[in-house]
A protein has these predicted regions:
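Conserved small/polar residues in nucleotide/adenosyl-binding loops
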Residues: 1-5
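Short beta-strand/loop motifs in extracellular/secreted proteins, especially
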Residues: 14
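Internal nucleotide-binding/catalytic subdomain
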Residues: 11, 25-165
């Protein structure tokens, strides 16, 4: 399907993601960064000119959270779920920063997450580490940084970031 047709199908509910390393600044969201389908198409063309690839995805509505899992090639040790500070300025009015930090409550929980949400995210990270080992013949060593979103339809994986890998 062509870009404009797919955007028309999604309406105002889309995200354009650079498929590559962008320092946390490759995602543009309809309504926040992109104010029309033309804006989205211009961004797509900019990415193509850079020699890059991109994804156009349906925008998910909910609360984002991250789950880091330390991997030694065999085992995973999960950190508490956290929420990222993605944007500069008060009230998240500025551009994406590429990561200013994360937070959780003093009890290491997030008020919008249930234990079942965290267990599901942990299971997804575990299954991903297992699949990487099966595909490449050796276990991943580093930090698997899963970006998730808790929606009305449940928890969904948005992306992975890899650290020290």
């Amino acid at each position: 399907m062509y870009k404009r047709q797919f955007l028309t199908l999604l309406g105002d509910n889309y995200v354009v993601k650079y498929d590559g390393l962008a320092g946390g600044k490759g995602v543009k969201v309809a309504g926040d960064h992109l104010h029309s389908h033309d804006d989205a198409l211009i961004y797509c063309e900019e990415l193509i000119k850079k020699g890059g690839h991109f994804l156009i995805e349906r925008k998910l509505i909910g609360e984002e959270f991250s789950l880091m899992s330390f991997c030694d090639g065999e085992n995973l040790s999960h950190m508490p779920a956290v929420q990222d500070h993605k944007r500069a300025y008060e009230g998240d009015t500025g551009p994406n920063t590429g990561g200013m930090g994360t937070y959780s409550d003093s009890d290491h929980k997030l008020p919008f997450l249930e234990n079942s949400h965290i267990k599901l995210a942990q299971k997804v990270n575990e299954q991903t580490a297992k699949a990487l080992k099966q595909k490449f013949g050796e276990g991943y060593k580093g930090i698997l940084y899963g970006g998730f979103i808790a929606t009305n339809a449940g928890v969904q994986l948005i992306e992975y970031n890899a650290r020290f890998g």
